[in-house]
């Protein structure tokens, strides 16, 4: 009968660990496979991955570059296609958050022209690209700026 306490791995599936420093006959006696002297033979030996033998490591030889703007965390671009999915006529930041077009942490939004747009809407206090501005005005929309 098969039971949980009789389950065992297949023969040869588990390797037996190497028993080092257990006499000459084992093949790993005396120095335990570490060789004689030197940094790697000592206990507690751990050499950094980036260590290059005293030579200045690659990560310090290469120049620093770039940065991640913290402004990008609170800024997002949206397209006119995203606006066309909103049923309301007046669109501001709160409306975009309400319809999950932008996340809660976003504070600045820029509308860019992408796709077609044929709904006259009023855009309040949002940044807008020149192409998108022209398209919204051509379909009878309005852009209101300022607080």
Curated annotation (Swiss-Prot):
The UniProt entry, under Pfam families, shows: Ribosomal_L27A
Assigned GO CC terms: cytosolic large ribosomal subunit
Q: Which UniProt keywords apply?
A: Ribonucleoprotein, Ribosomal protein, RNA-binding, rRNA-binding
Q: Which SUPFAM superfamilies match?
A: Ribosomal proteins L15p and L18e
**Molecular-function annotations in GO:** rRNA binding; structural constituent of ribosome
Specify whether Endoplasmic reticulum is a keyword of the entry. Answer: no
Domain of life of the organism encoding this protein: Bacteria
Is Cytoplasm one of the keywords? Answer: no
Gene3D superfamilies, per the entry:
3.100.10.10
Record-level GO BP terms: translation
Subunit record text: Part of the 50S ribosomal subunit.
HAMAP family membership = Ribosomal_uL15
Functional note: Binds to the 23S rRNA.
Describe the family membership recorded for this protein in Swiss-Prot or TrEMBL.
Belongs to the universal ribosomal protein uL15 family.
What this protein is called in its record is Large ribosomal subunit protein uL15
Query: What taxonomic ancestry is recorded?
Result: Bacteria, Pseudomonadati, Pseudomonadota, Gammaproteobacteria, Enterobacterales
């Amino acid at each position: 009968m098969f039971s949980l306490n009789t389950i065992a791995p297949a023969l040869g599936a588990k390797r037996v660990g190497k028993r080092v420093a257990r006499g000459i006959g084992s093949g790993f006696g005396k120095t335990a496979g570490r060789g004689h002297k030197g940094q790697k033979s000592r206990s507690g030996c751990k050499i950094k991955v980036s260590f290059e033998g005293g030579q200045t490591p690659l990560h310090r030889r290469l120049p620093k570059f770039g940065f991640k703007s913290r402004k990008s965390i609170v800024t997002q671009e949206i397209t006119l296609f995203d606006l066309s999915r909103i049923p309301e006529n007046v669109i501001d930041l709160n409306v975009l958050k309400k319809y999950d077009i932008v996340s809660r942490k976003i504070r600045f939004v820029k509308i860019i022209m992408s796709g077609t747009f044929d709904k006259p809407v009023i855009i309040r206090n949002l940044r807008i690209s020149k192409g998108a501005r022209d398209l919204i005005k051509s379909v009878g929309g309005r852009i209101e700026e300022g607080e």
